[in-house]
């Protein structure tokens, strides 16, 4: 039984978002649909989810004392992390004191960095992964690369959106790759993972929901990456029945091992019928924004339903759909969007995130489209995204 109070009343059900970006904004909107009181927290003011929250706070979420202070002040019933850069030791302490961390503090801590989740998947669960080594100094980084071999990929153990990642083909790139990885970590310089390159036909995100009525799967989401970040995603990604079964088995093992209720974005490589585990996020995934147009319940609605203790039931997928990011490059604290009217139409939508500024390249929106097939949906989404003119 799920009892929900009314926002801004004494019996309100309160949800605190740790991270208030575009994904958190959609989670906040889904909470608002249920009359839930939303508190958005991020490291900078006027973040997207703050626009649709009842209250907001700006703190360094890696500061355990600051995190504990804001949680103690607001007394949320649910703490919902949206990003990795959080003082997860503090979350585990607070969970031990009776607070509800979504999906659970252990999942948040293990997936905060690539080392925790890779060791869980490969060493504890025995799932197929790429070859890998970890390094915490430039000397051990060279040793790790020698063990893995060329070509390989280096990533900070804690980063997002491709920051700090390099594709290494030769020893001449090592010094630059190490320096770039040290600059790109979400918590500053530190450990890196060196991964062998996996031969694959395509990558998928398998949006997996762990809820009171069991584990549920959305149709697989295919996506194209560039510079470590996604550019387009589509659903459903066609794959063999055997590969889909194996993908679902891997995802089920991972989410049950992590524990808790919520939606998980399980990233996998697919080569023929073979499936290799890559990463997992214990929260909605950026490639899953396609579900805003492709499903009866988006990944954000599914996440909220699951952590509130509601059953999920059958997830309806409407048919071929795609998303394409709006990714301008400029510097401005007063961004405007022109020609939006030319982007939208029948079966085509645009979401603008409301980020307060841009300095360089930044994802400021996404175009969503349906089509007769996935290829058509991708073309329509890309065309819509290209028609939006971003000005400073």
UniProtKB/Swiss-Prot annotation:
<dbReference type="GO" id="GO:0043815">
    <property type="term" value="F:phosphoribosylglycinamide formyltransferase 2 activity"/>
</dbReference>
<feature type="binding site">
    <location>
        <position position="82"/>
    </location>
    <ligand>
        <name>N(1)-(5-phospho-beta-D-ribosyl)glycinamide</name>
    </ligand>
</feature>
<dbReference type="InterPro" id="IPR016185">
    <property type="entry name" value="PreATP-grasp_dom_sf"/>
</dbReference>
<comment type="pathway">
    <text>Purine metabolism; IMP biosynthesis via de novo pathway; N(2)-formyl-N(1)-(5-phospho-D-ribosyl)glycinamide from N(1)-(5-phospho-D-ribosyl)glycinamide (formate route): step 1/1.</text>
</comment>
<feature type="binding site">
    <location>
        <position position="267"/>
    </location>
    <ligand>
        <name>Mg(2+)</name>
    </ligand>
</feature>
<dbReference type="InterPro" id="IPR011761">
    <property type="entry name" value="ATP-grasp"/>
</dbReference>
<keyword id="KW-0460">Magnesium</keyword>
<comment type="subunit">
    <text>Homodimer.</text>
</comment>
<keyword id="KW-0547">Nucleotide-binding</keyword>
<feature type="binding site">
    <location>
        <begin position="22"/>
        <end position="23"/>
    </location>
    <ligand>
        <name>N(1)-(5-phospho-beta-D-ribosyl)glycinamide</name>
    </ligand>
</feature>
<feature type="binding site">
    <location>
        <position position="155"/>
    </location>
    <ligand>
        <name>ATP</name>
    </ligand>
</feature>
<keyword id="KW-0479">Metal-binding</keyword>
<dbReference type="Pfam" id="PF21244">
    <property type="entry name" value="PurT_C"/>
</dbReference>
<feature type="binding site">
    <location>
        <position position="355"/>
    </location>
    <ligand>
        <name>N(1)-(5-phospho-beta-D-ribosyl)glycinamide</name>
    </ligand>
</feature>
<comment type="function">
    <text>Involved in the de novo purine biosynthesis. Catalyzes the transfer of formate to 5-phospho-ribosyl-glycinamide (GAR), producing 5-phospho-ribosyl-N-formylglycinamide (FGAR). Formate is provided by PurU via hydrolysis of 10-formyl-tetrahydrofolate.</text>
</comment>
<feature type="binding site">
    <location>
        <begin position="195"/>
        <end position="198"/>
    </location>
    <ligand>
        <name>ATP</name>
    </ligand>
</feature>
<keyword id="KW-0436">Ligase</keyword>
<dbReference type="InterPro" id="IPR011054">
    <property type="entry name" value="Rudment_hybrid_motif"/>
</dbReference>
<comment type="similarity">
    <text>Belongs to the PurK/PurT family.</text>
</comment>
<protein>
    <recommendedName>
        <fullName>Formate-dependent phosphoribosylglycinamide formyltransferase</fullName>
        <ecNumber>6.3.1.21</ecNumber>
    </recommendedName>
</protein>
<dbReference type="GO" id="GO:0004644">
    <property type="term" value="F:phosphoribosylglycinamide formyltransferase activity"/>
</dbReference>
<feature type="binding site">
    <location>
        <begin position="160"/>
        <end position="165"/>
    </location>
    <ligand>
        <name>ATP</name>
    </ligand>
</feature>
<dbReference type="InterPro" id="IPR013815">
    <property type="entry name" value="ATP_grasp_subdomain_1"/>
</dbReference>
<feature type="binding site">
    <location>
        <position position="286"/>
    </location>
    <ligand>
        <name>N(1)-(5-phospho-beta-D-ribosyl)glycinamide</name>
    </ligand>
</feature>
<feature type="binding site">
    <location>
        <position position="114"/>
    </location>
    <ligand>
        <name>ATP</name>
    </ligand>
</feature>
<dbReference type="GO" id="GO:0000287">
    <property type="term" value="F:magnesium ion binding"/>
</dbReference>
<dbReference type="GO" id="GO:0005829">
    <property type="term" value="C:cytosol"/>
</dbReference>
<dbReference type="InterPro" id="IPR003135">
    <property type="entry name" value="ATP-grasp_carboxylate-amine"/>
</dbReference>
<dbReference type="InterPro" id="IPR054350">
    <property type="entry name" value="PurT/PurK_preATP-grasp"/>
</dbReference>
<dbReference type="GO" id="GO:0005524">
    <property type="term" value="F:ATP binding"/>
</dbReference>
<dbReference type="Pfam" id="PF22660">
    <property type="entry name" value="RS_preATP-grasp-like"/>
</dbReference>
<feature type="binding site">
    <location>
        <position position="279"/>
    </location>
    <ligand>
        <name>Mg(2+)</name>
    </ligand>
</feature>
<keyword id="KW-0067">ATP-binding</keyword>
<dbReference type="InterPro" id="IPR005862">
    <property type="entry name" value="PurT"/>
</dbReference>
<dbReference type="Pfam" id="PF02222">
    <property type="entry name" value="ATP-grasp"/>
</dbReference>
<keyword id="KW-0658">Purine biosynthesis</keyword>
<dbReference type="GO" id="GO:0006189">
    <property type="term" value="P:'de novo' IMP biosynthetic process"/>
</dbReference>
<dbReference type="InterPro" id="IPR048740">
    <property type="entry name" value="PurT_C"/>
</dbReference>
<feature type="binding site">
    <location>
        <begin position="362"/>
        <end position="363"/>
    </location>
    <ligand>
        <name>N(1)-(5-phospho-beta-D-ribosyl)glycinamide</name>
    </ligand>
</feature>
<feature type="domain" description="ATP-grasp">
    <location>
        <begin position="119"/>
        <end position="308"/>
    </location>
</feature>
<feature type="binding site">
    <location>
        <position position="203"/>
    </location>
    <ligand>
        <name>ATP</name>
    </ligand>
</feature>
């Amino acid at each position: 039984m799920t009892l929900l109070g009314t926002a801004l009343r004494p019996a309100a059900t309160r949800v605190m978002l740790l991270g208030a970006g575009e994904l958190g904004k959609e989670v906040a909107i889904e909470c608002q649909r249920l009359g839930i009181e939303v508190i958005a927290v991020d490291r900078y003011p006027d973040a997207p989810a703050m626009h649709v929250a009842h209250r907001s706070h700006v703190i360094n979420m890696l500061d355990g004392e600051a995190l504990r202070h804001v949680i103690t002040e607001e007394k949320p019933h649910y703490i919902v992390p949206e990003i990795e850069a959080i003082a997860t030791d503090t979350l585990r302490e607070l969970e031990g004191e009776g607070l509800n961390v979504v999906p659970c503090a252990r999942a948040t801590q293990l997936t905060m960095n690539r080392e925790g989740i890779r060791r869980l998947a490969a060493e504890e669960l025995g799932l197929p992964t790429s070859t890998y080594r970890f390094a915490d100094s430039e000397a051990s980084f060279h040793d790790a690369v020698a063990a893995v071999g060329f070509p390989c990929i280096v990533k900070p153990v804690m980063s997002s959106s491709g920051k700090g990642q390099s594709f290494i083909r030769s020893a001449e790139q090592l010094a630059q790759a190490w320096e770039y990885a040290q600059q790109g970590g979400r918590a500053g310089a530190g450990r890196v993972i060196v991964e062998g390159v996996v031969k694959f036909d395509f990558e998928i995100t398998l949006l997996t929901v762990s809820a009171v009525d069991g584990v549920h799967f959305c149709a697989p989401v295919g996506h194209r990456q560039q510079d470590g970040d996604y550019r387009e995603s589509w659903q459903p990604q066609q794959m063999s029945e055997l590969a889909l079964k194996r993908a679902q088995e891997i995802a089920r093992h991972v989410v049950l091992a992590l524990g808790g209720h919520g939606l998980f974005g399980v990233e996998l490589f697919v080569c023929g019928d073979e499936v290799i585990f890559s990463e997992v996020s214990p929260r909605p995934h950026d490639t899953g924004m396609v579900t805003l147009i492709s499903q009866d319940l988006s990944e954000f609605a599914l996440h909220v339903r699951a952590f509130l203790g509601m059953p999920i039931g059958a997830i309806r997928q409407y048919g071929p759909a795609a998303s394409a990011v709006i990714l301008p490059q400029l510097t401005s604290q007063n961004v405007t969007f022109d020609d939006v009217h030319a982007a939208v139409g029948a079966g085509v939508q645009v979401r603008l995130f409301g980020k307060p500024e841009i300095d360089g390249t930044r994802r400021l929106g996404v175009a969503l489209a349906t089509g007769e097939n996935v290829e058509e949906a991708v073309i329509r989404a890309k065309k819509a995204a290209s028609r939006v003119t971003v000005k400073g």
